[in-house]
Amino acid sequence: KGEAPAKSSTHRHDEELGMASAETLTVFLKLLAAGFYGVSSFLIVVVNKSVLTNYRFPSSLCVGLGQMVATVAVLWVGKALRVVKFPDFDRNVPRKTFPLPLLYFGNQITGLFSTKKLNLPMFTVLRRFSILFTMFAEGVLLKKTFSWGIKMTVFAMIIGAFVAASSDLAFDLEGYVFILINDVLTAANGAYVKQKLDSKELGKYGLLYYNALFMILPTLAIAYITGDAQKAMDFEGWADTLFLLQFTLSCVMGFILMYATVLCTQYNSALTTTIVGCIKNILITYIGMVFGGDYIFTWTNFIGLNISIAGSLVYSYITFSEEQLSKQSEASNKLDNKGKGAV
C-alpha cells in the first residue's frame, strides 16, 4: 500500500519525460518543415525570375503548365513505387478538393505573371498583403482571433508597402493588379488547405495530385486559345542548355514548393507558412536590389521597403512567441488534468 504513491509519481515523471521528448521532436519537425518551405520558395522565385525576365520566356502559362505536369508525374511515379499514398480517383474526389484546384491555378498563374512584370523588391513587398488577407481568411474560415501586437505589425508592413509603391519608378499597373490578386488567392489557398488537411479525406499527397491533375487540361486550353502555347513553341532559347536546365528546375520546383507549402501548413499553420515566406522575401528584396537588374533606387522606395521588412521581422517574432506560449499552456493543462486524474 505504501508503494503506490511512489509508483504513481514515477509513472507521472516518465510520462512527463516522454511528453518532453515528443515535444522536442515536434518542434524539430516544425522547424524543418518551415526551413524546407523557406528554401523552396526562395529558389523558385529566383529561378522563375531568371526564366521569365532574364531569358524573356514569353509564356507564364506554359511555365505553370510545366509545373502541373511535373507534379502529377512525380506523384504518380511515387504512388506506383509505393513511396507515397493517396486515394484513387472516384466521383467524390472533385467535391473533396473543391475549390482548391481553382485557387491553385489562379495562385500559380498570377504569381508567375507578377514575377515577370515586377522587380524583385516590389514583388516581395507587395506579397506582404498576403499576410493581411491570410488573417481575414483564417478569421472567416477557421474562426481564429489575432492579438493587438500582430495587428500593429501587419499594419506597419502594409504602410511600408504603400510608401515603397508611392515612388516605384518601375511602376507596372498589370503587375500590381496581378500580385494583389495573387495575395488574396494565397490567403484563401492556405486557409482551405488547412481545412482540407484537418478533414483527412485525401491527405497532403492527394490534395497536391488532384489540384494539379484537374487544372492541366483547362490550362492547356487557355494557353492554346491565348496563343501562349504557340509563343512558347516559337521561343528561340530551347537550344540553350542553361535555359533548359532552369526551365526544368522551375517545373520541378513548382511541385517541391507545393509539397513544402502543404507540409509547413500541416506541421505549423497557414499563418506560420506565410511568415516564413515573408522572411525569405527579405533576402530576395536585398538580393533583387543588387542582382535583379530591373530595380530603380529612390530613397522613399528604399525606406518603404525597410519599414515593411522591420514590420515583418517583429511580426514573425510575436507570432512564434504566441504560438509557443499557447502550446506550453496547453501542455501544462494536460499535465494538471492527468495529475488530478492520478490523485
From Swiss-Prot:
Biological process, per Gene Ontology: nucleotide-sugar transmembrane transport
Subcellular localization, as worded in the UniProt entry: Membrane
InterPro entries attached to this UniProt entry: Sugar_P_trans_dom, TPT_transporter
Cytoplasmic side: 1-26, 78-144, 194-204, 263-268, 324-343
Keywords annotated in UniProt: Membrane, Transmembrane, Transmembrane helix
Transmembrane feature ranges: 27-47, 57-77, 145-165, 173-193, 205-225, 242-262, 269-291, 303-323
Chief place where the protein resides: membrane
PANTHER family: SOLUTE CARRIER FAMILY 35
Record-given protein name: Solute carrier family 35 member D2-like protein
Organism expressing this protein natively: Sus scrofa
